[in-house]
Design a protein with these regions (language model features):
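Low-complexity, intrinsically disordered terminal/linker segments enriched in charged
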Residues: 131-170
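Short beta-strand edge/turn micro-motifs at domain boundaries
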Residues: 112-141
């Protein structure tokens, strides 16, 4: 899939380039803002709790989630140097989604890693990534479970999640 491969190539160029870790992180954040549906992933991650948000909470959550997502995503990826990802196949799931299958090529220090990209294709002019499934584990679903756990362990208090996200981002 051209969209995923070009996104991967941009990230690989950044990671393999002669940049400081901070520069890498900034460049990865730019790529994520352009190619990932951060807002959609954030709303999905809240699950049914999003229905109980007032406008202020929703706005605060979306802002906090974007900071959290970008920091988490870019700092994890910045650890890789010269990652080589090959797109293997793609399969249209339905009218709105295509699953793109790829592998992170093995090196001496790590085995092959299977990465599937769930791409939202409803608007062909504006493709966005909605989930990464790494070795069968959905990052969006994992995020949703973590957030539900935080909210549930705080008696359903969404503000506890907001505090947690803001603490992580600072």
């Amino acid at each position: 899939d051209v969209f995923v491969q070009s996104t991967v190539n941009r990230a690989a160029k950044t990671l393999g380039g002669n940049y400081t870790k901070e520069e890498r992180i900034q460049k990865l954040k730019e790529i994520a803002r352009e190619t990932v549906d951060i807002r959609g992933i954030g709303l999905y991650s809240l699950g049914s709790y999003r229905k109980g948000l007032n406008d202020d909470q929703k706005q605060s959550y979306e802002k906090a989630f974007e900071y959290y997502f970008l920091k988490s995503f870019s700092s994890r990826l910045a650890e890789y140097s010269n990652p080589e990802i090959e797109v293997v196949s793609k399969k249209k799931i339905n009218e709105n989604y295509t699953m793109v299958n790829s592998i992170l090529v093995a090196t001496e220090s790590r085995p092959v890693v299977k990465i599937d990209w769930r791409v939202y294709t409803k608007d062909p002019e504006n493709l966005v990534i909605r989930d990464l499934i790494i070795e069968g584990l959905s990052l969006a679903r994992t995020q949703k479970e973590e957030f539900a756990s935080i909210i549930n362990s705080n008696d359903g208090d969404i503000d506890a999640l907001l505090k947690n996200l803001n603490d992580f981002s600072n």
